[in-house]
């Protein structure tokens, strides 16, 4: 009977660790910080890249701000120069090694209407690219390359 009591906690701990290892890739997605902004106000959001494209360094990030966002500006960061053309902010000219975390900041005036808004991002690397443009449908599993979501309140 004593053996059973020790096996159950050990099995639970093993299952927890396995679950964390399986979930770990979800942390590698590009995310917005803060993820929530007030409608109709000026805000600055960092879109954080945590890795390259299959170990290749990031050389460019193209952030496609949705319609309704105005006064869009990119903030130069760590060797990257930000340029804005319409709704698109492009960070280029630098190299971000794989496994290095960096926030690429965009300032804007948020639209008035509340809701969840996906922000599509194209990550270009020395070898290849990753399109963070997939939108998660209600009740569906998270896609492989989800677009970060901003919540407008």
Label each region the model flagged.
Residues 35-73:
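Low-complexity, serine/threonine/proline/glycine-rich extracellular segments that form mucin-like
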Residues 2-4, 33, 37-39, 126-153:
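Extracytoplasmic/periplasmic copper-protein system
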Residues 64-88, 136-139, 148-152:
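A surface/secretory-pathway sequence property marking extracellular, secreted
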Residues 96-115:
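Low-complexity, intrinsically disordered segments enriched in Ser/Thr together with acidic residues
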């Amino acid at each position: 009977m004593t053996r059973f009591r020790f096996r159950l906690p050990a099995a639970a701990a093993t299952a927890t660790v396995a679950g964390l290892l399986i979930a770990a890739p979800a942390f590698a997605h590009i995310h917005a910080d803060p993820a929530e902004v007030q409608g109709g106000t000026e805000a600055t959001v960092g879109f954080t890249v945590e890795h390259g494209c299959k170990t290749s360094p990031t050389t460019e990030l193209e952030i496609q701000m949705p319609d309704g966002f105005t006064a869009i500006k990119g903030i130069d960061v760590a060797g990257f120069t930000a340029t804005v053309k319409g709704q698109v902010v492009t960070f280029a000219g630098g190299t971000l090694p794989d496994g290095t975390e960096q926030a690429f900041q965009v300032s804007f005036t948020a639209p008035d209407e509340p809701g969840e808004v996906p922000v599509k991002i194209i990550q270009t690397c020395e070898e290849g690219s990753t399109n963070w443009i997939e939108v998660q449908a209600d009740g569906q599993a998270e896609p492989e390359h989800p677009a970060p979501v901003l919540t407008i309140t």
